[in-house]
Structures are given as structure tokens and as C-alpha cells.
């Protein structure tokens, strides 16, 4: 399976795991809609954690950032998102995440960590 989305059973976290066979051009809209549905159904704000197990090209990073961070219905501006945490070792994604805090992307608050344990620890501090 190219990606997996799960709502934590007890904590207010949604985890998207992006596997190496994920095709952003074909699957981003699908995974975004699934996460949006979970957020719509939530009675409390969620920490949205994305675990990148794949390598993204610069074009994919730019396309992805524009699709999730800009526009009226952008997922990362959903009112039920408390914080976004990215798990990656990619320097390009790390720099892109910093850019998401700009006015162009609506001043998003995106953290980048290196492991799932670190992401869960950070998310639990916010809960």
C-alpha cells in the first residue's frame, strides 16, 4: 500500500505514512480527502503527523506545498488542525517546511522531526 492513514485511538493525532511507492500526482488528492474527512468528523483539534518514507523530487515538494498550503480549501489550513509535524531526514523538505511559515502559505506552523517517536513526543506535549 502506498500510504496509510490512521486516527490515533486515544490521542488527538492523525498519522499519514507515505511509503516509497506513493505517487503524489495520482494520490495526493485521495489522501488529502481522507484526512479532511477525519478532521471534519473530529470534535477536537488534531495534530497532523506526516511520515515521509519516500524521497520527493523538488517538483513534488513544490506541487505538494502548493496543494496543501495555499488556497481557500487547503488541507493544512483546516480549522481542526492544531499543528503539523513532518517526519523526514530530507533537507529539502525541512527547508520547505520553514517556508510554509511565510505569508504566501498563510503562516503555517510546521515542525520537522527525524523519527516517529520524536513526533509523538512533540504531539503529546501539545495535547
PLM features: residue spans?
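Amphipathic, Lys/Arg-enriched alpha-helical "gate/interface" segment within cytosolic domains
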Residues: 1-127
